[in-house]
From Swiss-Prot:
It comes from Flavobacterium psychrophilum (strain ATCC 49511 / DSM 21280 / CIP 103535 / JIP02/86). Keywords: Aminoacyl-tRNA synthetase, ATP-binding, Cytoplasm, Ligase, Nucleotide-binding, Protein biosynthesis, RNA-binding. This is Tyrosine--tRNA ligase. Residues 364-431 form the S4 RNA-binding domain. GO terms for biological process: tyrosyl-tRNA aminoacylation. GO terms for molecular function: ATP binding; RNA binding; tyrosine-tRNA ligase activity. SUPFAM superfamilies: Alpha-L RNA-binding motif (SSF55174), Nucleotidylyl transferase (SSF52374). ATP binds at residue 237. Its EC number is 6.1.1.1. Catalyzes the attachment of tyrosine to tRNA(Tyr) in a two-step reaction: tyrosine is first activated by ATP to form Tyr-AMP and then transferred to the acceptor end of tRNA(Tyr). It catalyses: tRNA(Tyr) + L-tyrosine + ATP = L-tyrosyl-tRNA(Tyr) + AMP + diphosphate + H(+). L-tyrosine binds at residues 33, 172, 176. Its main location: cytoplasm. Homodimer.
């Protein structure tokens, strides 16, 4: 087998592993899993590392299992959390499970039948019929409270000021541990992977497998590092909050812009983590970028690869066109091809004014539009001078002083874009 661990190390995707893990992965095709708790109806780019890890696993000939925590999601993982999580109601949880299934299915084909075909499971399916007494006898008996108390996630919560930790969250590591035992027994799963903050929960699982699996039972663990920005700040958030993997929560345009605005240092790091480009290709891109940083070769390639991976090539092309409207050459047709939501995102922060649809239906001379109707320019004189200098455009098309604004100039029957010079924009919102 090709060495998966070596691949993860040069990509910056490796943090730690249990002894014997690398040997197991190079010896034979191995089944491994990663869990995703349904705390929302989508996943954000922070979860991309784990999804990418599952894809690498499959590409190296191993069998990936994606586990959705329908049961653990009812409890809430205390790892890295300072406060108790609010419990989700069943309807919300079911909606979230369906949403995460859809996201994972866009990266891994769970319908293939080859030997290392990915599997999608939900731990609610094997936990729902477990009575409390049965769980306490069969699972709780195998792990001591001392062992559970030694975990960092527990220590931090019990040592911090506040409410401490409920019994519900305290049992989380036991339920996650049993997931590993169940998958070991039913799918011959030998490895659990996850973020470095999951080490405590994962090793509870390896311990449970060894204690319940009998003589010779093997279980391994591998974790990825916490991804941060070059300045040490948390990765995965923009000014508007989380960057999600579904367009209903983060538009493709905003997703595209997030990656395009990556710093040079971060781009060099992220292109190894978030793309499947090989080492020679990436090394070549890094060298090319160093010779001409202003061309942003790394950022553009990173953005292109990850936007195609998450949203597809067609959506990438739309995002590029949308970006060119504000930052490059574009036409009136490009502008009119935008939906209303993308139009507003592109021109977010651009000055706006409302204008009466009745006025536009009657037709308004451009001088009046630029001054009295919008306040875009300070006076009729300034408007006429700008028009004489050929520096005024309506919807990306240059106009003269004789131009009359009418309903045919509306974008999405709602907007008109005014422009003075190269960079001064103004949006008319037709009401």
């Amino acid at each position: 087998m090709k060495n998966l661990v070596e691949e993860l190390k040069w990509r910056g995707l490796f943090h730690d592993m249990m002894p014997g893990t690398e040997e197991q992965l190079t010896k034979e095709s191995t089944t491994a899993y990663i869990g995703f708790d349904p705390t929302a109806d989508s996943l954000h780019i922070g979860s991309m590392v784990q999804i990418i890890l599952l894809v690498h696993l499959k590409n190296f000939g191993h069998k990936p299992i994606a586990l959705i925590g329908g049961a653990t999601g009812m409890i809430g993982d205390p790892s890295g959390k300072s406060d108790e999580r609010n419990l989700l109601d069943e309807a919300t949880l079911n909606k979230n499970v369906a949403g995460i299934k859809a996201v994972l299915s866009s990266f891994l084909d769970f319908n293939t039948t080859n030997a290392n075909a990915p599997i999608l499971v939900n731990n609610y399916d094997w936990m729902k019929d477990f009575s409390f007494i049965d769980f306490a006898r069969d699972i709780g008996k195998r792990i001591t409270v001392n062992y559970m108390m030694s975990k960092d996630s527990v220590k931090k919560r019990l040592g911090a000021e506040g409410e401490g930790m409920s019994f519900t969250e305290f049992t989380y590591q036991l339920i996650q541990g049993y997931d590993f035992q169940y998958l070991y027994k039913n799918h011959n799963c030998l490895l659990q992977m996850g973020g470095s903050d999951q080490w405590g929960n994962i090793t509870t699982g390896t311990e449970l497998v060894r204690r319940m699996g009998g003589e010779g039972a093997k279980a391994y663990a591998l974790t990825t590092p916490l991804i941060t920005k070059a300045d040490g700040s948390k990765f995965g958030k923009s000014e508007g909050g989380n960057v999600w993997l579904t367009a209903d929560k983060t538009s493709v345009y905003k997703f595209y812009q997030f990656w395009l605005n990556t710093s040079d240092d971060d781009a060099e790091k992220y292109i190894k983590i978030f793309t499947f480009l090989d080492k020679n290709t990436i090394d070549g891109l890094i060298e090319e970028h160093k010779t001409a940083p202003h061309l942003r070769v790394l950022q553009r390639k990173l953005t292109e690869e990850i936007t195609i991976l998450v949203h597809g090539k067609e959506e990438l092309e739309k995002a590029i066109k949308a970006s060119n409207i504000l930052f490059g050459n574009s036409t009136s047709n490009d502008l009119k091809g935008l939906d209303a939501a993308t139009f507003l995102e592109i021109f977010d922060g651009v000055p706006q004014a409302e204008i009466s649809k009745t006025d536009i239906e009657a037709g308004i001379n451009i001088v009046e539009v630029l001054n009295e109707k919008s306040g875009f320019l300070k006076s009729n004189g300034e408007a006429r001078r700008a028009l004489s200098a050929n520096s005024i455009a309506v919807n990306k098309e240059k106009v003269t002083e004789e131009f009359t604004l009418t309903t045919k100039d509306m974008i999405n029957n709602q907007f008109v874009l005014l422009q003075s010079g190269k960079k001064n924009y103004f949006v008319l919102n037709v009401k």
